[in-house]
Swiss-Prot record:
The lineage of its organism: Bacteria, Pseudomonadati, Pseudomonadota, Gammaproteobacteria, Pasteurellales. It comes from Pasteurella multocida (strain Pm70). This is Probable GTP-binding protein EngB. It comes from the Bacteria. Residues 27-201 form the EngB-type G domain. One of its GO terms (biological process) is division septum assembly.
Length: 205
């Protein structure tokens, strides 16, 4: 484990890409953020970086259709992947997204970890499980963030976290589960600590 702590508040937008072929060179370390279209992915990125509009939050889920890259430090990037599984998106587009997501997880050499965000009230939908499977198959560590934790009481929250921790045991990969709330800042420290540990190899060079 590294003791180097990155300052995520310095994160800035780098570039957008329609697919993996248009991404910048495959070097340094990238950490991907993935989740259903309404899981609160952009909100979590904004909370982590303490910037209100770093990642555009949208009232229309499924808005983030590009792969958006943000730079924390040189060689350290956060990648906001297109939200998946929104009903109002045409089937053809859904298939394209899923193909792009799968391709990115399997082929991107600099990808060091995946943060998968799920609404704590509706975790582990089919596509969430697919993402965990892909990540584990690609030997990538996963942090599952159960978002919108402020919507539940403390006891209901603990119960959901425990349930998800038990449900993911069959995946057998390096998967950690944490409750998260952008509203009352729950889980932000744990998210930052996990990212620090994933970025550590490039920082200690």
């Amino acid at each position: 484990m590294s003791d180097i702590k990155l300052n995520y508040h310095k994160t800035h937008f780098l570039t957008s890409a329609p697919d993996i072929r248009a991404l910048p060179e495959d070097s340094g370390i990238e950490i991907a953020f993935a989740g259903r279209s309404n899981a609160g992915k952009s909100t979590a990125l904004n909370a982590l970086t303490n910037q209100k509009s770093l990642a555009r939050t949208s009232k229309t889920p499924g808005r983030t259709q590009l792969i958006n890259l943000f730079e924390v430090e040189p060689q350290c990037r956060l990648v906001d992947l297109p939200g998946y599984g929104y009903a109002a998106v045409p089937e053809q587009m859904k298939i394209q997204w899923q193909k792009a997501l799968g391709e990115y997880l399997q082929k991107r050499q600099c990808l060091a970890g995946v943060v998968i965000l799920m609404d704590i009230r509706h975790p582990l939908k089919d596509l969430d499980q697919q993402m965990i499977e892909w990540a584990v198959a690609s030997e990538l560590p996963v942090l599952l963030l159960l978002t919108k934790a402020d919507k539940l009481s403390q006891s209901a929250r603990s119960k959901q976290v425990k349930m998800v921790r038990e449900a993911i045991l069959p995946f057998q990969g390096d998967v950690q589960v944490e409750a998260f709330s952008a509203l009352n800042k729950t889980g932000i420290d744990r998210l930052a600590a996990k990212l620090d540990s994933w970025f550590a190899p490039v920082l200690s060079e």
